[in-house]
C-alpha cells in the first residue's frame, strides 16, 4: 500500500480545519497509509529547511505558487503513475512565510493550486481533499463529477 506523507510546517489552530484534514486522512486510509508530519515553525523558511528535507520520503511534491497547475484529473494520473511505480509521496506545505528555495529545488515536483495566496492552514484541507479526489478518480468513483 502506498504511503502518503503530508509534511507541514506549523500547527493548525482552528478546530474546523483540523477536523476537515482528519476526515480526509481517514477517507484516504482506504487507499494509502497516511502520515501527517507537523514540524515547528522556524524564524524563517531557511531555518525550517533541514527538518523539512529530513521528513520527506519518496517522491516529494512541494506546494509553491511558481509550481505547475494541474487539473484534478491530471493530479490523479500523476498519483496513479507514482503508485504504479511503487513510490511513496511526500507533499510539503511551508509555513505562512513559504518554503525555502533549498526545499523547492530539492523537490521532485512543484505543484501550484493557484496564483492566489491561501492561508497555509486552509491549504492543508484543500490538499488533503484533492489527494483524496485523485484516489477516487482513479477508483472510478462518482465522487468527482
Summary of predicted features, one role per range:
Residues 1-24:
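N-terminal beta1-alpha1 ligand-phosphate binding loop
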Residues 6, 61, 94, 127:
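Conserved RecA-like P-loop NTPase ATPase core
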Residues 7-9, 37, 92:
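Short hydrophobic segments within beta-strands
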Residues 12, 65-68, 95-98:
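Short glycine-rich anion-binding loops that position phosphate/pyrophosphate groups of nucleotides
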Residues 23-31:
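A short, Lys/Arg-enriched amphipathic alpha-helix followed by its capping loop at the start of a domain
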Residues 24, 78-82, 106:
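Catalytic-core regions built around general acid/base machinery
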Residues 101-145:
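Structured adenosyl-cofactor binding patch, chiefly the S-adenosyl-L-methionine
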Amino acid at each position: 500500500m502506498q504511503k502518503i506523507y503530508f509534511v507541514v510546517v506549523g500547527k493548525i489552530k482552528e478546530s474546523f480545519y483540523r477536523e476537515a484534514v482528519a476526515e480526509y486522512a481517514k477517507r484516504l486510509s482506504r487507499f494509502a497509509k497516511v502520515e501527517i508530519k507537523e514540524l515547528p515553525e522556524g524564524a524563517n523558511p531557511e531555518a525550517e529547511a533541514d527538518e523539512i528535507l529530513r521528513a520527506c520520503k519518496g517522491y516529494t511534491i512541494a506546494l509553491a505558487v511558481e509550481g505547475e497547475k494541474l487539473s484534478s484529473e491530471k493530479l490523479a494520473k500523476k498519483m496513479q503513475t507514482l503508485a504504479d511505480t511503487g513510490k511513496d509521496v511526500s507533499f510539503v506545505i511551508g509555513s505562512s512565510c513559504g518554503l525555502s528555495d533549498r526545499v523547492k529545488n530539492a523537490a521532485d515536483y512543484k505543484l501550484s493550486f493557484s496564483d492566489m495566496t491561501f492561508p497555509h492552514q486552509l491549504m492543508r484541507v484543500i490538499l488533503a481533499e484533492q489527494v483524496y479526489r485523485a484516489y477516487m478518480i482513479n477508483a472510478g468513483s462518482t465522487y468527482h463529477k
